[in-house]
C-alpha cells in the first residue's frame, strides 16, 4: 500500500519578502541618517574649533601689540606747525577708523616680531597696522591682515602682509577717551595728529571681531570682543582751539 507523505516545509510568500525588504530599507535608512548626522556634527565642531582658535590668536596678537603701544609726549611730541617741513606726519601717531563693517588701525608698538636679517638687533619699535582685504585666492572671502614695519614713515598696506584670520564678516573698533571717569566718550575714528582731536590719544580701545563658518557664511558668526586700557596716553591740549 502506498503512503502519502505530507511535506510541511513552506517557502516565503511574496508579501513576506516585500515586508522584509521594506523593514531592511527602514533600518538602513535610519543607520545611514544617523551616520551622516554624526559626520556633519563632527565636521561642524571641527570647523567651529578652528574658527575659534583663529579668532583667539588674532585677538591675543592685538592685545600684545596694544599693551606695548608707544605714545610720545612733549617735548618729544611736536605739533604739526612746529615740525620740520620733511616731517609732516608724526611717525608715532595713532590712527583708527571704524565707520563701516571693517575698521583700520595704525599705531607704533614695542611688540615688533623680529626677523633675522630684516630687524635690528634687540628688536625695536615698529608701526603696526590692522586692516581687512579680499583674499587673493577668493574675492568672496575677507581676511584680516597685520603689517609690522620698522620703517615708521613708509605706508603699511602692501596687501602682502601676513593673514591673521580668514572669513571675517566684521571688524569694529570703539575709541574711548576720558579725563574723568564720569565723562567717558566713545568715537568711531581717531587721529592723534588731528587738531580736531587736540592731538590726544585714546585712553582705551574696544575691539569686536566677527568670523563666519566658511560652509555657512550667512548664519550667525562667531563674535570675539575685548578691550584694552592703554598704559600710556596723551591728554587733549587745552591750548588748542
Language-model features, listed with the residues they occupy:
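Short, solvent-exposed loop/turn segments that connect beta-strands within catalytic domains
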Residues: 135-141, 153-157, 180-184, 215-220
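N-terminal leader/signal peptides at the extreme start of proteins
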Residues: 1-12
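Residue-level detector of short, conserved catalytic/binding motifs and their immediate flanks
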Residues: 12, 128, 205
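Short linear sequence signals and composition-biased patches located at protein termini or domain-edge surfaces
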Residues: 162-165, 169-241
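Extracytoplasmic beta-strand-rich oligomerization domains located immediately C-terminal to a leader/signal peptide
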Residues: 34-156
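Alpha-helical hydrophobic helix detector
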Residues: 17-33
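Short, mixed charged/polar active-site loops
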Residues: 121-127, 156-162, 219-225
Amino acid at each position: 500500500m502506498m503512503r502519502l507523505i505530507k511535506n510541511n516545509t513552506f517557502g516565503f510568500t511574496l508579501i513576506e519578502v516585500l515586508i522584509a525588504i521594506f523593514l531592511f530599507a527602514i533600518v538602513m535608512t535610519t543607520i545611514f541618517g544617523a551616520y551622516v548626522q554624526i559626520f556633519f556634527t563632527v565636521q561642524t565642531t571641527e570647523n567651529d574649533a578652528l574658527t575659534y582658535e583663529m579668532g583667539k590668536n588674532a585677538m591675543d596678537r592685538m592685545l600684545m601689540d596694544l599693551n606695548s603701544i608707544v605714545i610720545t609726549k612733549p617735548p618729544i611730541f611736536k605739533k604739526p606747525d612746529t615740525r620740520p617741513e620733511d616731517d609732516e606726519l608724526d611717525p608715532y601717531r595713532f590712527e583708527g577708523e571704524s565707520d563701516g563693517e571693517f575698521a583700520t588701525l595704525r599705531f607704533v608698538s614695542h611688540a615688533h616680531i623680529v626677523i633675522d636679517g630684516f630687524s635690528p638687533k634687540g628688536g625695536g619699535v615698529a608701526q603696526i597696522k590692522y586692516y581687512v582685504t579680499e583674499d587673493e585666492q577668493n574675492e568672496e572671502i575677507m581676511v584680516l591682515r597685520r603689517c609690522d614695519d620698522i620703517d615708521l614713515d613708509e605706508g603699511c598696506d602692501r596687501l602682502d602682509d601676513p593673514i591673521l584670520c580668514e572669513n571675517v564678516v566684521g571688524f569694529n573698533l570703539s575709541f574711548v577717551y576720558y579725563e574723568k571717569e564720569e565723562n567717558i566718550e566713545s568715537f568711531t575714528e581717531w587721529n592723534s595728529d588731528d587738531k580736531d582731536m587736540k592731538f590726544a590719544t585714546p585712553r582705551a580701545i574696544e575691539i569686536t571681531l566677527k568670523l563666519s563658518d566658511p560652509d555657512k557664511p550667512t548664519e550667525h558668526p562667531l563674535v570675539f570682543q575685548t578691550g584694552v586700557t592703554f598704559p600710556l596716553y596723551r591728554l587733549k591740549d587745552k591750548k588748542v582751539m
